[in-house]
Amino acid sequence: MSGWMPSPGNALAPAGLRLLRSLAAGSAVVLSVVLPTAVAAADEPAGATVVGRLVQAWAESFPGKAGHADDGQLSWVEPAEGDPVLVDSAGVEGVPSGSTVAVTLGTDGPDGSGDGALPVLDTQVLGHSSSELPAPAPSTNQVTVAMVAPAGSDPAGDGTTLEQVVSAVEDRVAPFWAEQSDGAITLGVTEIHDWTAAAVTCEQPGQLWDDIAARVRFEPGPGKHLLLYVSRGAGCGYALAEVGTAPSSGGRIYVTDTSTSAIAHEFGHNFGLGHSSAEQCDGAVEGGFCRTVAYRDYYDVMGVSWSQTGNLNAAQAALLGLLPEAQQQLLSVKGSAITATLTPLSGRVGTRALRLTDADGIVYWLEYRTATARDGWLASSANRFGLESGVLLRRAGGLPDTSVLLDGTPTAAAGWDGDYRATLPVGVAVTVSGGDFSVVVQGLTPAGAVVSVAPNSPAGGGAPAAPAPRIPHGGVVLPGSGEAAAETLAPTVEEAPEVGAPQFSGAVQRVGPDLEPASEATRGSGALVVGAGALLVGSTLLVARRLWTGALRHH
């Protein structure tokens, strides 16, 4: 996958070595760890120089599994020959993923943990991934589908047929992305390969992809995707996808399900998207006592997977360049007050989004969701969570949450778990970004939402609300600096009353996510949540825990 590099919008935040230790040892505490075992086992002497491709990752927890390490960045160097070498992310900070580097290593494990994460004494960038790859043919993304039984599983597979997977891509996923991109993204299955027994397990996903790619003669490149369907009984994660930089990046995926939302979500990662998550604050839209929950945007395909495959929201569409300038109106904190009419996002005409940029350059998006076209389920019995039509407010961000849904009708922390209402109230001024903007929804009709926005330019720069601590599926909250506090297991969320509604489930039983108790949630922005798994950026991987109609789906 050399030749691909992350865009500035996909930059990763720094992270501590506690994360690296957890991923190296995580196989003892989770059902499966997707980080290649060779990374954790790398053994290089102090002072050695390793030359290879830099790979960067973001760790996330398996659902319902508490007691791992913080979310954060992983980095390793892949030499041309031999095992990858896990290194301290701080030593390669600012180096784009995919670059060719020469890294001089320090002594083993700065805290003596023996985790294999090595300090970096010096880093030299020998070459960057080319950002000038030739684009594929217009509106063409070629998909190679292969059915795979990882080592140790039944070589005959799990009963899923090649035809089912091909149909999922061509009949459901391809039309979805063609619709979302107004025809700019066209997925087509160009090669198919029936069940084959792999020589490696899912614990080494890179090697699994490489093994199958060699067998089917798949050549990576722009607009080329390798989609593996792997046996459900092989102990693999629910799904895994490389994170690209654009819809033309191509990339590799494996899935254990043929659901539309699951496969469409994974292609979204290949195209360059992170997750659509949600932030909840105690009685406020932003600021104060808050939490951010991974995947909790049920409106959006990049949120949790369930029976509805939601429209790509404005923040995610803009990230891919799929929201035309003519369909968005821009306003900065230094601008003048405006009143605009937002047309339904699903209608794909008119002004579909307002983009607000605060004093620090943070971008917020307003969009109008109605029960029309792809969002028609909002007015049907399929709307299991009672999601509302109305104006939604999101904050754009970097990986892993490239979109964060804000709660326009916030409740007290005690009611967070059962609160799925997020639309802005009509006739009520809502403060955005610590007062940089005041937003009022003046009225709603099926044809549009009238929205007034008044900027408040601060004299000495903005003071936006700090991002809330991010809470993935499962985990405990730890301090963001200093030594880890005593771990506190969190309660589960009550299951929605409708049978089959997706939940943030545990690894072996249908339960809610292990969220931090509202009474114990961390104030401010200095908390991290434990995690294991991997989100790899650029020419790397993304692991997402997803659920389908109430049954466990983990990856």
Predicted regions and their residues:
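Structural detector for short beta-strands of small beta-barrel domains
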Residues: D43-S75
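Propeptide-to-catalytic entry region of secreted or membrane-anchored zinc metalloproteases
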Residues: D83-P84, A90-A102, G106-A262, F271-G283, ...
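Secretory targeting and sorting signals
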Residues: S2-A42, A527-W548
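Short, aromatic-rich amphipathic segments at membrane interfaces
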Residues: A507-S525
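Extracellular hydrolytic enzyme modules, especially secreted metalloproteases
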Residues: P220, H225, R232-W377
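Non-catalytic C-terminal accessory/binding modules of secreted extracellular proteins
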Residues: A90-E93, G250-G251, S346-P513, A532, ...
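Short, solvent-exposed loop/turn elements at domain surfaces
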Residues: F62-P63, A151-T160, T309-A314, A373-W377
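Short consensus segments that form the blades of beta-propeller domains
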Residues: G64-H68, P134-P136, R291-T292, L378-F385
